[in-house]
């Protein structure tokens, strides 16, 4: 069974835990209890493949920012979550993305931009803005509601698909026949 290490990042109060719990336990948590760090595991079938999702739900509060580098190192893919009724959380996405790229030492890291709380009528972040940001990053954008479950599976499953594509790309680029297992050219005698 293939395992995927997913990390949910974003500002405090955007619904990272609510999204994760909705996926794992199929229920909505409406009281706000700031997370320090929680880990969840769930077995799912995505595109006919049985997968084990190892999901790290992270702290959005600034006082826990020192922990970010550590979980960013171990994560394979990132759900970058903002709340559609919180413009500051949308602006913060770039900070998370830049930190992920720095820690991973790569511009090519599987990510999905997630606009949560789409069930709320008080939108301050336009869908078009979010689509444009995602397009500029070269990543998918999905609107979700942890309350109604809209887009929840889609967000996590899309991230798994992004990780699969990334793994295949890495496999193909290292499997071009020019390098042996020690990183040296092979010589047939």
Swiss-Prot record:
GO molecular function: G protein activity; GDP binding; GTP binding; GTPase activity; protein-containing complex binding
Domain of life the protein comes from: Eukaryota
Outcome of substituting residue 89 to A: Abolished phosphorylation by STK19
Topological relation to the membrane, as annotated: Lipid-anchor
Gene that specifies this protein: NRAS
Record PTM Phosphoserine, positions in chain: 89
Protein name in UniProt: GTPase NRas
Catalysed reaction, written as an equation: GTP + H2O = GDP + phosphate + H(+)
GO biological process: MAPK cascade; positive regulation of endothelial cell proliferation; Ras protein signal transduction
PANTHER family: RAS, DI-RAS, AND RHEB FAMILY MEMBERS OF SMALL GTPASE SUPERFAMILY
Record text on activity regulation: Alternates between an inactive form bound to GDP and an active form bound to GTP. Activated by a guanine nucleotide-exchange factor (GEF) and inactivated by a GTPase-activating protein (GAP).
This protein's record includes keyword RNA-binding: no
Subunit structure: Interacts (active GTP-bound form preferentially) with RGS14. Interacts (active GTP-bound form) with RASSF7. Interacts (active GTP-bound form) with both SHOC2 and PP1c (all isoforms) to form a tertiary complex; SHOC2 and PP1c preferably bind M-Ras/MRAS, but they also bind K-Ras/KRAS, N-Ras/NRAS and H-Ras/HRAS.
Key words, A-Z: Acetylation, Cell membrane, Disease variant, Glycoprotein, Golgi apparatus, GTP-binding, Hydrolase, Isopeptide bond, Lipoprotein, Membrane, Methylation, Nucleotide-binding, Palmitate, Phosphoprotein, Prenylation, Proto-oncogene, Ubl conjugation
């Amino acid at each position: 069974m293939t395992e995927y290490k997913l990390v949910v990042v974003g500002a405090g109060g955007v619904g990272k835990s609510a999204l994760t719990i909705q996926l794992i336990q199929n229920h909505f948590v409406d009281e706000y209890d700031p997370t320090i760090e929680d880990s969840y595991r769930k077995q799912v079938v995505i595109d006919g493949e049985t997968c084990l999702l190892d999901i790290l739900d992270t702290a959005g509060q600034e006082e826990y920012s020192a922990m970010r580098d550590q979980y960013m190192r171990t994560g394979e893919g990132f759900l970058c979550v903002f709340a559609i009724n919180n413009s500051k959380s949308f602006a913060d996405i770039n900070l998370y993305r830049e930190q992920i790229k720095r820690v991973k030492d790569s511009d090519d890291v599987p990510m999905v931009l997630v606009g949560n709380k789409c069930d709320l009528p008080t939108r301050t972040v336009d869908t078009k803005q979010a689509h444009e940001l995602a397009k500029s990053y070269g990543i998918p954008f999905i609107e979700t509601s942890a309350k109604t479950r809209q887009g929840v599976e889609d967000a996590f499953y899309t991230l798994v698909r992004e990780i699969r594509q990334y793994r295949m790309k890495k496999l193909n680029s290292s499997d071009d026949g020019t390098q042996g297992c020690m990183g040296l050219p092979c010589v047939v005698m």
